């Protein structure tokens, strides 16, 4: 534990133009709400690139931050002594009161934005900016404080030598090889094989949502660094699907807590949590709500390990209830796996049973990389007809499933006039129910994880039967499923007896609220059965 007055403080420095980003508002909101020890330093030169602050900002950084309850100091950032004193004062206050402070430092812009965007093209304040240059002002302060001109020259020369030495060192550093491009996309994981007991004896099947709940409860009991947060997961409700029920009561509000409707914060905060040794499990309440968080997922979470040469993997789990269920309508029914599959640097699971969900949550926890787990709402309670097999015996505490390992749901050793269905999530149950109409003709593979994908199982199964249907809940055009179909077509071409078929929802912008239209849009067992007939007859 640090000594009094030496507690850690986070320093966040950014420009005045970036303060208008919506994610800054989310950060200020949570910093103020949770009394986080953060010092925000805004360097305000009044310019974006060519747009001036008077055109772009309704209020300056000071007034904006006060709206979130942050204490602020406004300073002349070219005044070294006042800046130094104010920053020290702010740090002491943050440590004593444990609350965020923003310092609004007004500074000149002394150079071009880039070599291709020249300041003389659009600015009429260049003389004024040069008159505010902090460097000559600092030299005058040093002279007033008994430094000699020779001492100041020596300080300047020492700084030049340091910069030049660092530059020379960088120039002499070995260039990367082409092979270096392919390192550090993921941190290595130790979870390489399935372990533990999947179906212990003398137990009754449990619903899928409880399998996840039990997995997280076991993890939080064993690991004090494990946190769970998101919208409505706290004590009052325990999740809108009861997926976090009792966890806040058991582990306290400091480890299980609600967040505002701030998906960018929910996802982006995992970077910092992971960096200080915590393991965040966060929830985006519906897949439809993940869009505001994609910037953080794409630009920060997925790339951290790669851009830091393996030093800063973001170890987190992002739970996302997904899929159409019970006329949820256009804002509660979407599928998002195709977009997520285009984000390199994250792992994606989409289990179809409680046992798989528990095993994959455990695997994700011990994986040092960011993992998104897509959990179909219609399978949580097995209330949809034909999904009872989503209920499973709860696996043992040590049960774990490696990513990139699919499951044979329905095996078929017969290869005479047969076919296979490659699917995941709700598609597993459409396929199973359709297969009842085609006895001994169908083999079903549940890929379980979208990335990494069990290509060997998929390709071996397609090669075995020669005919294949890739089944998804998403609209099929331009989807992950369609891309998978192309991979199968390429790798299994010589053994195919028919083109690789694909089926998904109708290619419409959204899933309607009306139940008749929802039913019309989605695949179902009857539609799958009809396509099976077509493929077998090909």
Task: Please identify what each model-predicted range represents.
Residues 21-42, 302, 306, 455-460, ...:
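A short alpha/beta connector and helix-capping loop motif
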Residues 1-11, 22, 26, 41-172, 242, 246, 312-314, ...:
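Thiamine diphosphate
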Residues 24-27, 85-92, 303, 355-361, ...:
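Glycine-rich, charged/polar anion/phosphate-binding loops
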Residues 17-22, 78-87, 351-358, 365, ...:
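Active-site glycine- and acidic-residue-rich loops that bind
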Residues 8-19, 35:
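DG-centered beta-turn motif at the end of beta-strands
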Residues 30-32, 64, 93, 272-273, ...:
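Hydrophobic/aromatic ligand-binding patch that stacks against planar heteroaromatic rings
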